[in-house]
């Protein structure tokens, strides 16, 4: 199964349809995706593609998500230009000085595991590490947290919600879009804090 991108997920569905003699059902799903994406893509035709940097947060650290990762593929589907696209790896470990040279228009922050810890880590680092204050994306208020249920490590059928969330972030055409992007980011951060993921993880560890 190729779950690193939405198209990859649907290619896998087609392959499984052939294996299990379910070609018609598989093709129906593929056709639904094609119709959805063609309509979505038309909304952004002719628009400038913003430069985007994606931070995938882990407890205690973060890495860069490239277009070869699922989150990166979603941003690419939405028309964003990943500033770390010249690689065949899914994720990169990069220092903030190198990130600064890329000058992204937008910084997206996603959480892989224990989202409650990750959002606190991001907030602390962006507040205390002075270099972030020199990024144009930070100066311009274009740093956004993403809903962890939509922007994980593997493709899911929640990609329409993910693309809808990216729309006002990448292409704000009005004050209402800018406000919506901020509200979505605030909600994503609140949901992460309220997830109770760390507590659940501790309970699992204690039960072993």
Can you describe what each PLM-predicted range is?
Residues 1-60, 81-84, 139-207:
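Extracytoplasmic substrate-binding proteins
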Residues 1-19, 94-134, 168:
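Acidic/His-rich segments in extracytoplasmic proteins that coordinate ligands and/or metal ions
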Residues 35, 91-94, 127, 161:
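Short, conserved clusters of charged catalytic residues that mark active-site
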Residues 45-48, 76, 100-102, 135-139:
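Extracellular/periplasmic catalytic domains that process cell-envelope and extracellular macromolecules
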Residues 57-59, 67, 87-88, 104, ...:
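Histidine- and/or cysteine-centered catalytic micro-motif in compact active-site loops
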Residues 60-65, 109, 116, 152-155:
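Short, solvent-exposed loop/turn elements at domain surfaces
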Residues 63-92:
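Alpha-helical, coiled-coil/dimerization segments enriched in small aliphatic residues
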Residues 68-69, 129, 135, 156:
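Serine-centered coil/turn micro-motif
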């Amino acid at each position: 199964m190729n779950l690193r991108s939405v198209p990859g997920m649907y290619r896998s569905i087609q392959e499984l349809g052939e294996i299990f003699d379910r070609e018609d059902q598989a093709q129906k799903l593929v056709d639904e995706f094609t119709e959805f994406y063609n309509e979505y893509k038309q909304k952004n035709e002719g628009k400038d593609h913003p430069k985007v940097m994606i931070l995938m947060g882990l407890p205690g650290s973060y890495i860069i998500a490239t277009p070869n990762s699922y989150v990166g593929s979603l941003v690419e589907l939405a028309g964003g230009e990943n500033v770390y696209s010249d690689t065949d790896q899914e994720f990169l470990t990069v220092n903030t000085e190198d990130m600064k040279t890329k000058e992204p228009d937008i910084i997206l922050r996603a959480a892989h595991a224990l989202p409650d810890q990750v959002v606190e880590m991001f907030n602390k680092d962006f507040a205390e590490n002075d270099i972030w204050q020199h990024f144009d994306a930070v100066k311009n208020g274009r740093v956004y947290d993403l809903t962890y249920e939509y922007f994980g490590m593997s493709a899911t059928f929640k990609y329409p919600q993910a693309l809808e969330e990216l729309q006002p972030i990448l292409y704000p055409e009005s004050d209402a879009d800018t406000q919506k992007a901020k509200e979505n980011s605030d909600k994503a951060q609140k949901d992460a804090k309220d997830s109770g993921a760390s507590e659940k993880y501790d309970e699992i560890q204690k039960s072993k």
